[in-house]
Amino acid sequence: MLCVGTIAFFLYTFYDKKLDASLDAEGLEPEEPFRMKDIVYIITNKGFWLIALLCVLFYSAVFPFIKYAADLMVQKYNVDPKLAGTIPGLLPIGAIILTPLFGSLYDRIGKGATLMIIGSVMLIFVHTMFALPILNIWWFATIIMIILGFAFSLVPSAMWPAFPKIIPEKQLGTAYALIFWVQNWGLMGVPLLIGWVLNTYCKGPVVDGAQTYDYTLPMAIFALFGVLALIVALMLKAENKKKGYGLEEANIQK
């Protein structure tokens, strides 16, 4: 994968230079160069921070969860360790199918901020169900994982198309770099937090030479991230109404 990515980078660089040369030959103005004041504009934009916070909170409740999901299936739902990765594996498979569908839905009907709110509510529901000591059966875990797949597809399909409506096009590349920087802090810190919580507060007895864990507290933490994501999504909808970003408007105008 790294080799393919490296090849893609060189191809992109080649065609980007070719495009610049073509624009020069046609006498068209090149893109505006990067300026430090662009960063200042972006980080003083409240809409940017709301999207960035929603991004880091939402993904922090999904990707780190996937890291521990297989063990959760074994510890709580008594799934065979050889099959434990199958249920969490439904998440990315579902996202491949659902994300384009939800993206098309957003293009046609709009309601981007509303879709992000709905996805955040679904995220809270999923992690609350995983935290509660009810129905510790594999098929229940499968249903909950499918619902998480819907949320995992719904929020990004509305969040990423909404981003260019908040940030001017000439600053969009810088804004994407900043939002991924913020996101990666969360993706770095949350697994460390969950691992520390498990080792400090959630250890159970050793069974057949293997350490057991109670995942109630980690799932409650993930649910808390969902609650915070919901609050931010509601704030984003209010900011959209105030600033007129057009997040609730369809991208395809009839």
Regions found by a protein language model. Name each.
Residues V79-P88, I137, A141, D214-Y215:
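Juxtamembrane helix-start elements in MFS-like secondary transporters
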